[in-house]
């Protein structure tokens, strides 16, 4: 893929000088993305390199200096400390990084998704319309779980998208949106939801040996009806069968803002003796995921691997530790698109899937105004890595 990107990108002129602003909660990911871009562009040879259109194409870093200082009252302002006039600007933001804190009237306050979203708007406001183009890369889409209205509820995700577009954002790139149809709120602007299926499969195959990738020995499971699309895609590219659970809820009661789940009912063929891949967009508390894994174990499933784009682990890691000790789960794979605690990274059952190279490819390609269709469809790359695994070359 790298060679294909090189060839395609060299055929087009960049939209503008590339600039990346990594908001405070997203610094480590932004630095990794920057390293890839610096390396690729330093090695890239082109007869047009000296032309004016390629001015500032090769630099030591594409990260621009920006900060969001706060007053003692907790109010903040966005500051960009270098010129962004004419740049093709990419803003990286992790709205789930609760490790970030600020002082509020002498008290330490942890940043909520609302705080991160406000900081993003402050930086866009600080740009002041000077950038050639603004693309927001928001891996976990802000308020994406509030994508539809039930009774008298606010449509926060749609409001946020419309607000960003009204501020001059041209494209919004997110990963594994809870419901991609939320883009209906901004039908005339760019919205891409990227799937990390290739990175999950690569992470699993590199860390777990002796897997038999066929429908007699492995199966893909969707833990609920909402995640069927992801499971169907992975099942199809790997040539596996798919099963699903649906949640039976008690609609007479509301607990913590939602109807409680009474039971997980399974639909699918026999799972006995097969390895399971459970795939979902996020692990919140993880209770549903562990209940599904336990239900599969009761049906005599073999190893259980969990793929989840966003590992929130809102109730801590203890339940996952216990499930691992009791042989209910074998591995949990999530991405580094959101904040990961040091404790999570040390867990024996955890595999981290690095997405920085993928983001760098997307930024590099978009900066040249090239199509990212190949990047959004990883089928060819998945087939290549599966073939290598079967030959024992991984």
Where in the sequence are the language-model features?
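PRPP-associated nucleotide enzymes
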Residues: 1-394
